[in-house]
Every structure is written in structure tokens, then in C-alpha cells.
């Protein structure tokens, strides 16, 4: 039994090593494609939020309006390319004749690209970390709409890059005081009190309605 387990481990490890070597080329290809496409667009704002937000809801309409106004100011709009908040933001961009970018991710349960992305600005990714580089590298600001784990991941990614000075400080807005207030309370009452962040870290972003 032990010999069988050892054999399986060794086989799995060798197969994993071989697969990892080929993955490098796929990762490099995603970086190159992303850099080439996004470097041509100009100043952009990334808008993050839930894929589950339905048309006709307050935050869907608000996302559409925010994207439309930012587009009218000359910014390209980058989203995750899926439904919900992402669709709303891309839709608002198209209505303003702006540059509508979608960074779609291949997932087992979602998501197909929404219908409001410029055809030459739709990129598909297998790797979340490559996709996040594209969001952050080419954005001059960030809008965080209500969302789930993915949105929180993106929020903490950006705020960490700014806090650690890997990024210059730039506007980061959390939209929806009622939605975000619980998180802010935790940051203030737990993380700050425990000494794990500094008071100035809480000034890296702003909450609005």
C-alpha cells in the first residue's frame, strides 16, 4: 500500500512538473496580449462589482451612469467583462461612445462576455493574477461597486499595492455607504486597533453614495 502511494505521488509530481513548464508559455502569452492591447487605449478607470447584480436595480443603473460620465470625460472603462455590474459599466461606456474594455476570465460556472464590449478590446484570461495585473497597470483610478469575494479580492489587491508604494496613490472609490460600512467598521475596530494597519491607510480610499 505504501509503495503504491509513493508511486502515485511520484507520478503526479512528475506530471505536475511537466504541466507547469508548459503553463509558463500560456502565462507569457496572456501578459503579452494584454500589454499590447491595453497600452493603445489611453487613460482608463477600472470598475469592479458583482456579476449577480440585475438590470433594473439601483446599483446596476448607478454603475451605468458612472461609466457613462467617466467616458464623457475621456476615460476608457475596464471591467471584468461579465454580467451584472460589469455589463452595466460597459453599457454606460458604449452609450457615451467611449472605449469599452472587458477582461473576461474563463470559469467553470460563469461567465460569458457581455454584449457591450468593443470587439477589439475583449481579452480572455485563464489566470486571475495576469488579469489583475491588467486591471491595475492600465488604470488611473478605481471604482468599487458592491460585490462578492472577487470584488473584495480586487479591492484589497489595489489598496495593498498603494499602501506598499508599489503603486502611486490614485483615486479609489467605494460606492454604497450602507454596503461597505460593515467592512470599514471592521478595518477601524479590529485591524486598526490591533495595530495591523495605520490610520493613514484608511485614507487610501473614499466611500460615497
Regions found by a protein language model. Give the residues of each.
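Short, conserved catalytic or adaptor-binding loops enriched in Gly and charged residues
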Residues: 114-117, 194-201
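Acidic/glycine-enriched connector segments
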Residues: 84-144
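Active-site/ligand-binding-proximal alpha/beta "capping" segment
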Residues: 126-175
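Residue-level signal for short, function-critical loop segments
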Residues: 51-53, 147-148, 178
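A charged, well-structured terminal subsegment
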Residues: 137, 141, 198-209
Amino acid at each position: 500500500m505504501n509503495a503504491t502511494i509513493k508511486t502515485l505521488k511520484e507520478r503526479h509530481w512528475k506530471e505536475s512538473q511537466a504541466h507547469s513548464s508548459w503553463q509558463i508559455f500560456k502565462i507569457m502569452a496572456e501578459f503579452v496580449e494584454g500589454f499590447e492591447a491595453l497600452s493603445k487605449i489611453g487613460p482608463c478607470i477600472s470598475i469592479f462589482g458583482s456579476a449577480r447584480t440585475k438590470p433594473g436595480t439601483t446599483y446596476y443603473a448607478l454603475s451605468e451612469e458612472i461609466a457613462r460620465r467617466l467616458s464623457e470625460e475621456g476615460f476608457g472603462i475596464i471591467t471584468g467583462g461579465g454580467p451584472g455590474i460589469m455589463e452595466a459599466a460597459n453599457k454606460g461606456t458604449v452609450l457615451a461612445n467611449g472605449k469599452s474594455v472587458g477582461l473576461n476570465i474563463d470559469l467553470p460556472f460563469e461567465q460569458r462576455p457581455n454584449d457591450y464590449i468593443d470587439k477589439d478590446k475583449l481579452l480572455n484570461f485563464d489566470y486571475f493574477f495576469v488579469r489583475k495585473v491588467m486591471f491595475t497597470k492600465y488604470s488611473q483610478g478605481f471604482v468599487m461597486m458592491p460585490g462578492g469575494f472577487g470584488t473584495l479580492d480586487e479591492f484589497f489587491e489595489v489598496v495593498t499595492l498603494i499602501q506598499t508604494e508599489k503603486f502611486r496613490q490614485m483615486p479609489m472609490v467605494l460606492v454604497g455607504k450602507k454596503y461597505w460600512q460593515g467592512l470599514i467598521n471592521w478595518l477601524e475596530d479590529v485591524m486598526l486597533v490591533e495595530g495591523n494597519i495605520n490610520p493613514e491607510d484608511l485614507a487610501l480610499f473614499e466611500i460615497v453614495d
